[in-house]
Amino acid sequence: MILVSDNQFLHLGALAAWHDRATEHDLYDVQQLSVENFRHPPELSPFLYFTHMTMERSCTQCHQRKVRCSKTLPCSACVRLGATCRFPTTDANAHRPRRVQKITITDRIAQLERSLTILANSAGPLQGPENPNVRDTSTTLLPEPPQSPNRAQEVLVPDGASTRYINETFLSQILDKERALYKVIGTPRETEEITSGLRPEGLLASSRRPTNWSNELELSRWQSAQLWQIYRNNVDPVVKILHLPTVEPLVYATMNGEGSDDCRALLFAIYFAAVTSLSEVDAANLLGRDRRSCLLDFQARIEKVVIDAACLDAPTMLSLQALAIYIPVPSLRNRTDFYYETCLRAHRTSRSGWIMNGVLIRAAQSIGLHRDGTHFHLTPFDAEVRRRLWWQIIVLDYRAAEDHGLAVHGFGSRSDTRLPLHVNDSDLSPELRILPGPRAKWTEMSLFLLTSEIAIAFQKVYHTTVDHTDNAQRLQTVQELTAYLESTYLCHCDTNIPIQKVAWLSTRSLLSKFEFFVYQLSLNNEQSQEAVSSAAERTLISACACLEQSMELQTDDLLRGFRWLFASYNQFHCLMYVLWHLCAQPTGPHVVRVWNIVDLVFNVTENDPTRPDPGPTWKVLQHLREKAAQRRGNVAMSPPTQAHGPSDERVPESRTAEQHSGQELEGTGDGFGDLLAPPLDPSSLTEWINLSENLGMYRFEP
């Protein structure tokens, strides 16, 4: 109790309770009050009655008596009784919670969606009504990555035109609470001019033009527009990275000199890819210069713009799209003295291209492309464009690694980015709030999705353990995938239309290769001679089908506009197997078919000067072809009774002829010797796996 004036006291607890809830304005009013401001009720009380002081809770006396309290200090009931009026002290934890903001509700819903996604993935796919045209576009065929407790703590920080993906737990929590720190963590730009000479992008740039280069290619706007149309016709249908309706205005604006560095990088990459798809004659007629010099000029411009735009320090969607079409590399040693990533395969399937694709993957991860855009509340359109770019990069990585016999464990297995929708570009726009459903017809994304679906399934099978019990499951995976692709995509293909025929042939070729891979694994598991022969025949048929469909892609005149890409997809693994089979079994029901496709592959590869350098693997294939031809000649000169049948009596003679031909090859001085000439008889087909695996351990100089 404190004395205010004569016979006027204020209960200390009540004042403290009011003070805890009082606003700054209330406290100011109290300071201005005098004793005259206090009103005494008719029943004079020794306690102060303050009319402005309204309590939120009933006093202790009224609460115990279960009567209504006026919640004034003192309350009317205590005044009538002459009792001391005490109010309970304020409990900070008893405050009414603040009103939940809309953004908080959105965050909670997003967190719930992520939790449900993780739960669904861990529990397996739910069984529901089947619809052949609807499929979960998440990477269900890839092995699920281990769930990290930090997965929910991630943020996409704006960084100028770029973004920065952060999933470190403590830092992401701070950034999520303090959005003002986004500017602090961004890439510093005020020191770019000072440090420009020390930036690491220079490592990626090859030598520019020759030292005596003085005639820079100057394109007219008509030539630029023609190159853009060539890109749309020859490149975009088979390399579906761009959303043409939104990119086209940027392309024409950049042609007129209005674009940023990122836009210029994309424009030069488009020029580069367009010229790559042209023949020597067509390039000279359009640009008035030979094709090689035009490509060197565009290469130099891309390298300069990539460094000026700091595409690795602050990658953007435009710059990554440009890099996905083209990546300069430090070594320029091949027929045409240059190569690049998507268009790289049109000149040389070099290991450096695969290595540089890893740089592109890291840049994509730095802006969170490996995480689906729904985690960051992006617009449906932005999330869909990111999916296209990410999966194009991943599929390229699979194919590039395969060129060099490298086991790809796959960045895709550590990603939850969904596959893009099966829609046309016209179905998407930045204004969309809800994405359309997949189309039950041919779309511009059909070829892209066909390739991606097969690549995902192949990675799943590739990483399963090799044992006999799994082979039936692998074959079932291939059969289910084939049925799904036929019912969803291939049934809408009209093979009279060039791009749809490309999709049909390339899909059939890849599925045959998938079957070849699965059957090939069974060669190591089968024990009996009959089982080995049966598996070898199935493997041979699949390899021939893959080669035949691949060669039709490269030789069909209707598909000439896409030959620049498919000429680089050399099915050397299948070719090596059929040559091995011809060495092991020079006779049989499929020999004529096998030799026809072998001769076609060698004629096209060796007699077309515009094709990329096949690399050192070609030396191995040439050696096996010579070996198979010698075996065929030996069989032709043998008596008919010795030319057929795998009986035990005839095997020693076959082995003797094989050894004789092997000795002749050893004397040629080609350096291969017994490495590529092991005992080749029907029972040695199981050694094919050992050869195909061990070839990567040796270095064959051209």
UniProtKB/Swiss-Prot annotation:
Gene3D superfamilies: Zn(2)-C6 fungal-type DNA-binding domain (4.10.240.10). The gene is asaR. It is found in: Nucleus. Keywords: DNA-binding, Metal-binding, Nucleus, Transcription, Transcription regulation, Zinc. Residues 59-85 bind DNA. This is C6 transcription factor asaR. InterPro entries: Sec_Metabolite_Reg, Transcription_factor_dom_fun, Zn2-C6_fun-type_DNA-bd_sf, Zn2Cys6_DnaBD. GO terms for cellular component: nucleus. Residues 629-679 are annotated as: Disordered. It comes from the Eukaryota. GO terms for molecular function: DNA binding; DNA-binding transcription factor activity, RNA polymerase II-specific; zinc ion binding. Disruption phenotype: Abolishes the expression of all the 7 aspergillic acid biosynthesis cluster genes and reduces ferriaspergillin production. PROSITE patterns: ZN2_CY6_FUNGAL_1, ZN2_CY6_FUNGAL_2. CDD domains: fungal_TF_MHR (cd12148), GAL4 (cd00067). The keyword Transferase does not apply. Pathway: Secondary metabolite biosynthesis. It holds the Pfam family Fungal_trans. Residues 646-663 have a biased composition (Basic and acidic residues). Induction: Expressed during the earliest stages of maize kernel infection. GO terms for biological process: DNA-templated transcription; positive regulation of metabolic process. The keyword Phosphoprotein does not apply. Transcription factor involved in regulation of gene cluster that mediates the biosynthesis of aspergillic acid.
